[in-house]
Amino acid sequence: LILVACLMMSCVHCKKDGYPVDWNNCMYDCGYDNAYCEKICKEKGGESGYCYFWKISCYCEGLPDNVEIKGYGRCRG
């Protein structure tokens, strides 16, 4: 029982959602192009992606835990 609880708490293949960023900490602008965002997200190992209307930036779902997403900090590009 303890082993099962430990396995459930440790996330071996965690997934997260968010705005992926490039090496300059900048989000990917998409101009309402869902296909472009889907491609970016799949290349980063995500399950799906789309162009988020309000930010006009790509939003990914199911990204691996090691992929950087937009947090704090300014775009340096």
UniProtKB/Swiss-Prot annotation:
| Gene3D superfamilies per record | Knottin, scorpion toxin-like
Query: Where would you find this protein in the cell?
Result: Secreted
What is any one of the record's Gene Ontology cellular component terms? extracellular region
Q: Indicate the secretion signal residues.
A: 1-7
Entry GO MF terms: sodium channel inhibitor activity; toxin activity
- Mostly located where? secreted
Task: Respond yes or no to whether keyword Lyase is given for this record.
Answer: no
State the Gene Ontology BP annotations: defense response
Show the Pfam families listed in the entry.
Answer: Toxin_3
Listed disulfide bonds for this chain? 26-75, 30-51, 37-58, 41-60
Summarize tissue expression.
Answer: Expressed by the venom gland.
Q: For the LCN-type CS-alpha/beta domain, which residue ranges apply?
A: 16-76
InterPro entries in the record, alphabetically?
LCN-type_CS_alpha_beta_dom (IPR044062), Scorpion_toxin-like (IPR003614), Scorpion_toxin-like_sf (IPR036574), Scorpion_toxinL (IPR018218), Scorpion_toxinL/defensin (IPR002061)
Q: Which UniProt keywords apply?
A: Disulfide bond, Ion channel impairing toxin, Neurotoxin, Secreted, Signal, Toxin, Voltage-gated sodium channel impairing toxin
Print the domain comment field: Has the structural arrangement of an alpha-helix connected to antiparallel beta-sheets by disulfide bonds (CS-alpha/beta).
Family, as annotated: Belongs to the long (4 C-C) scorpion toxin superfamily. Sodium channel inhibitor family. Alpha subfamily.
Task: Describe its function.
Answer: Binds voltage-independently at site-3 of voltage-gated sodium channels (Nav) and inhibits the inactivation of the activated channels, thereby blocking neuronal transmission.
Q: State the name under which the record lists this protein.
A: Neurotoxin LmNaTx21.1
- Taxonomic path: Eukaryota, Metazoa, Ecdysozoa, Arthropoda, Chelicerata
